[in-house]
Amino acid sequence: MIKIGKDLSKFSVKSEKPSTKDELTSIIENRMRKYGNECDMNDIDISLITDMTHLFFGSEFNGNISKWDTSHVTDMSYMFAWSSFNRDISEWDVSNVNSMNCMFTHAEFNQPIGDWDVKNVRNMSWMFSESKFNQDISRWKTGRFANLVNMFFDCPIKEVYKMK
């Protein structure tokens, strides 16, 4: 069965390369209107984007962005807060991210991200607060000055999965 309007790989779509968060936001909104909340957006080249704050805040987007090149992103604060997003982003390069403040707060997200390199993240406060997250991140190593205030507030994560 073919899902028309969901998987963009079935269509000839010109890859887009936004240079600002506003351009990226516009592309995402247009794609969601045209193809729905579960559309594949892996063809969007986000390699110039450094700020992803509030990108999917309160959104019902739950499409594929697993192959995005996030290696230049420095801020992911509130990126998926209050959103329905719950897809694989385990391969993202987050090694240059400084802030993940409230990134998944109140979100549906519950996918493995235990292999992320978070050593440069300085702010993880409220990151998973009141979210569905319950995955193993015990191998994460943060800098000694990282803000972890209420990172797991009212989150169902098991103690053994938390950072050591």
Locate each region found by the language model.
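Negatively charged
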Residues: M1-K164
